[in-house]
UniProtKB/Swiss-Prot annotation:
<comment type="subunit">
    <text>Homodimer. The RNAP catalytic core consists of 2 alpha, 1 beta, 1 beta' and 1 omega subunit. When a sigma factor is associated with the core the holoenzyme is formed, which can initiate transcription.</text>
</comment>
<protein>
    <recommendedName>
        <fullName>DNA-directed RNA polymerase subunit alpha</fullName>
        <ecNumber>2.7.7.6</ecNumber>
    </recommendedName>
</protein>
<dbReference type="GO" id="GO:0006351">
    <property type="term" value="P:DNA-templated transcription"/>
</dbReference>
<dbReference type="InterPro" id="IPR011263">
    <property type="entry name" value="DNA-dir_RNA_pol_RpoA/D/Rpb3"/>
</dbReference>
<dbReference type="GO" id="GO:0003677">
    <property type="term" value="F:DNA binding"/>
</dbReference>
<comment type="function">
    <text>DNA-dependent RNA polymerase catalyzes the transcription of DNA into RNA using the four ribonucleoside triphosphates as substrates.</text>
</comment>
<feature type="region of interest" description="Alpha N-terminal domain (alpha-NTD)">
    <location>
        <begin position="1"/>
        <end position="236"/>
    </location>
</feature>
<dbReference type="Pfam" id="PF03118">
    <property type="entry name" value="RNA_pol_A_CTD"/>
</dbReference>
<dbReference type="GO" id="GO:0005737">
    <property type="term" value="C:cytoplasm"/>
</dbReference>
<dbReference type="InterPro" id="IPR011260">
    <property type="entry name" value="RNAP_asu_C"/>
</dbReference>
<dbReference type="Pfam" id="PF01000">
    <property type="entry name" value="RNA_pol_A_bac"/>
</dbReference>
<dbReference type="InterPro" id="IPR011262">
    <property type="entry name" value="DNA-dir_RNA_pol_insert"/>
</dbReference>
<keyword id="KW-0240">DNA-directed RNA polymerase</keyword>
<dbReference type="InterPro" id="IPR011773">
    <property type="entry name" value="DNA-dir_RpoA"/>
</dbReference>
<dbReference type="GO" id="GO:0003899">
    <property type="term" value="F:DNA-directed RNA polymerase activity"/>
</dbReference>
<dbReference type="Pfam" id="PF01193">
    <property type="entry name" value="RNA_pol_L"/>
</dbReference>
<dbReference type="InterPro" id="IPR036603">
    <property type="entry name" value="RBP11-like"/>
</dbReference>
Length: 330
């Protein structure tokens, strides 16, 4: 029975109709009125654009220097071969982000994905997928293919700009379509629960490349959506702490030697005799203290005061925590 008017019905997975190994229809009901389109559109966009998967991103074909060429004994030109490689459905074991697979074939006939040589960490989901055709018994083709894990769609031009090193001649880049979902559509039909007839039924029609089960695809898409909405569940004003620039403990001028003041020889020698080596040492002295220094008269005192004033300093200043550790260690 229906509870409070504020309670929402929770959908359940009603049926998975497996039309083929790569095509399925998934039905969820009941949904509150309007939620069929709300959830259907959100899941559709995530399934098309945000599902992680593996794709061919680079290939090296023996005897081929660039993509605008042909290869003797091969029916297709190189651009056609690259387009066919984009349709390769590859599943790579978790924990590996990139792998290399090889293809070596000779003799007349089609070259298919099942001819690819790989280790146990790689599975080809469409082994009958045609890559090219060899036209005579003496024809042969050899290629090294790089497969990478990623998300969404990344054109080859984007990777060209990101490459730090110059790309070797003969390494051909392929537009990468990582998503294992080829086609996705949804329909909203009427549903009924007891006396309520204004509910929605969501039917998702999905085709994949065979590397991901439809039920798992929806589960992953729903998880991505839920994670993105988590921020709205506990809506708070989360302030990012401002990065404060670390200010030096002392004005850098105080750490400079007294010699930088370019005093007369008489004044400089008097200060050194009193172990006043840094400007920070000097500004903490008072006029009375300096006048007690042997051989330092009023003329030298006036000189020191004028030089300090030109730098915005004066005698009798108080400096907390002086001297700093860097000077104390010296």
């Amino acid at each position: 029975m229906q509870g409070s008017v504020t309670e929402f019905l929770k959908p359940r997975l009603v049926d998975i109709e497996q039309i083929s190994s790569t095509h399925a229809k998934v039905t969820l009901e009941p949904l509150e009125r309007g939620f069929g389109h709300t959830l259907g559109n959100a899941l559709r966009r995530i399934l098309l654009s945000s599902m992680p998967g593996c794709a061919v991103i680079e290939v090296e074909i023996e005897g081929v220097l660039h993509e605008y060429s042909t290869k003797e004994g091969v029916q297709e030109d190189i651009l056609e071969i690259l387009l066919n490689l984009k349709g390769l459905a590859v599943r790579v074991a978790e924990g590996k982000d990139e792998v290399f697979i090889t293809l070596n074939k000779s003799g007349s006939g089609p070259v298919v994905a099942g001819d690819i040589t790989h280790d146990g960490d790689v599975e080809i989901a469409n082994p009958e997928h045609v890559i090219c055709h060899l036209t005579d018994d003496n024809a042969e083709i050899a290629m090294r293919i790089k497969v990478e894990r990623g998300r969404g769609y990344v054109p080859a031009s984007a990777r060209i700009h990101n490459e730090e090193d110059e790309r070797p001649i003969g390494r051909l880049l392929v537009d990468a379509t990582y998503s294992p979902v080829d086609k996705i559509a949804y329909a909203v039909e009427a549903a009924r629960v007891e006396q309520r007839t204004d509910l929605d039924k969501l039917v998702i029609d999905m085709e994949t490349n065979g590397t991901l089960e439809p039920e798992e695809a929806i589960r992953r898409a729903a998880t991505i959506l839920a994670e993105q909405l988590d921020a709205f569940v506990d809506l708070r004003d989360v302030r990012v702490p401002e990065e404060k620039e670390e200010k030096p403990e002392f004005d850098p001028i105080l750490l400079r030697p007294v010699d930088d003041l370019e005093l007369t020889v008489r004044s400089a020698n008097c200060l050194k005799a009193e172990a006043i080596h840094y400007i920070g040492d000097l500004v903490q002295r008072t006029e009375v203290e300096l006048l007690k220094t042997p051989n330092l008269g009023k003329k030298s005192l006036t000189e020191i005061k004028d030089v300090l004033a030109s730098r915005g300093l004066s005698l009798g200043m108080r400096l907390e925590n002086w001297p700093p550790a860097s000077i104390a260690e010296d």
